[in-house]
Swiss-Prot record:
Protein's UniProt name: Holliday junction branch migration complex subunit RuvA
Major localisation: cytoplasm
Protein family per UniProt: Belongs to the RuvA family.
Annotated keywords: Cytoplasm, DNA damage, DNA recombination, DNA repair, DNA-binding
Chain spans, region Domain I: 1-64
Function: The RuvA-RuvB-RuvC complex processes Holliday junction (HJ) DNA during genetic recombination and DNA repair, while the RuvA-RuvB complex plays an important role in the rescue of blocked DNA replication forks via replication fork reversal (RFR). RuvA specifically binds to HJ cruciform DNA, conferring on it an open structure. The RuvB hexamer acts as an ATP-dependent pump, pulling dsDNA into and through the RuvAB complex. HJ branch migration allows RuvC to scan DNA until it finds its consensus sequence, where it cleaves and resolves the cruciform DNA.
Organism: Saccharophagus degradans (strain 2-40 / ATCC 43961 / DSM 17024)
Oligomeric and partner information: Homotetramer. Forms an RuvA(8)-RuvB(12)-Holliday junction (HJ) complex. HJ DNA is sandwiched between 2 RuvA tetramers; dsDNA enters through RuvA and exits via RuvB. An RuvB hexamer assembles on each DNA strand where it exits the tetramer. Each RuvB hexamer is contacted by two RuvA subunits (via domain III) on 2 adjacent RuvB subunits; this complex drives branch migration. In the full resolvosome a probable DNA-RuvA(4)-RuvB(12)-RuvC(2) complex forms which resolves the HJ.
One biological process term in Gene Ontology: DNA repair
CDD domains reported in the protein's UniProt record: UBA_RuvA_C
Ranges where the record places region Flexible linker: 143-157
Length: 207
């Protein structure tokens, strides 16, 4: 089992990223909470991973902290919640998700991508005791790379690419194309310089 990856961030297009380790590229699926903390392309990234095997696929999921990986593992134990839906749910910070569950906030949960009322109700029941065991104390996540957290502005900003990438990411998380386009359009402004910034702003308006 692969528990952690340390390598060069070669590609990133939410929710997928590619980590190059000694010339071998590892395709990793990561939640947006991890994407927000990624370093720039070409820099070293460290990810805590979970290897998922099913009858039809083998997938590697990556997280910026052990806490997030633990939440992912808790989520996929819930009936009806697979890895893809768990990644969508983790568009919300683990501490915020735990608070929603403990507060019984059904309204907030149904706004998460792919989560309907029945799934939200199941999450409230099945996750209540589990999140109590999760360390949700606000703290700095372990950096995903040496340059993580540094704001970089690309001198050439292609607005169309940023918008297209953001919409694609939201659709990949489980939102309908019309929902994604509407959220991205509402969130975009001239201060946004990366697709990650736009995705974060769009999700903030939806969740």
């Amino acid at each position: 089992m692969i528990g952690r990856l340390t390598g060069i961030l070669a590609e990133k297009k939410a929710p997928h990223l590619l980590i190059d380790i000694g010339g071998v590229g590892y395709d990793v699926i990561a939640p947006m909470t991890t994407f927000y903390r990624l370093p720039a392309l070409g820099e070293k990234a460290v990810l805590h991973t979970h290897f998922s095997v099913s009858e039809t696929s083998q997938q590697l999921f990556g997280f910026s902290s052990q806490q997030d990986r633990e939440l992912f593992r808790m989520l996929i134990k819930v009936n009806g919640v697979g890895p893809k839906l768990a990644v969508g749910i983790m568009s919300m910070e683990s501490s915020d998700f735990a608070k929603c569950v403990l507060d019984g906030n059904l309204t907030a949960l149904v706004k998460l991508p792919g989560v309907g009322k029945k799934t939200a109700e199941r999450l409230l029941v099945d996750m209540r005791d589990r999140v109590k065991a999760l360390d949700t104390t606000p703290s700095e996540h372990s950096p995903t790379g040496e340059g993580a957290g540094i704001v970089r502005v690309d001198p050439v900003i292609n607005t169309n690419v940023i918008i297209a990438d953001a919409e694609s990411a939201l659709i990949g998380l489980g939102y309908k194309p019309t929902e994604a386009a509407k959220a991205v359009s509402a969130a975009y402004n001239d201060t946004i310089t990366t697709s990650e910034d736009l995705i974060r702003a769009a999700l903030k308006g939806m969740i």
